[in-house]
């Protein structure tokens, strides 16, 4: 749910031409929207992998790490949007909070996976639903 909430909020804010002028549509806005969707895609792909298989576990760790990197990149774009005057400080704080919640959940999930690699059942996480 958290990823979905982040994507919905990201699209709601960035689709407003009152906030983000059209001249930034194909530069900043598209990158912001793509990062939010990329976070979801990485978590979904990682969640589909089986921890019982070593190669899938390694791939899952890589996807989780990539999702964390995308969270950091999205946070940068959110901050940049505020600094450029496209969003208020209050909007920046709320949007950042959503992104940070996702980031912390992915980090905790990644850490938990490291301690669960020896169990026989694959771990599924509700972050992406």
Where are these regions (language model features)?
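Amphipathic alpha-helical assembly/interaction segments
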Residues: 1-116, 120
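Single conserved hydrophobic/aromatic residue that forms the stacking wall/gate
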Residues: 117-129
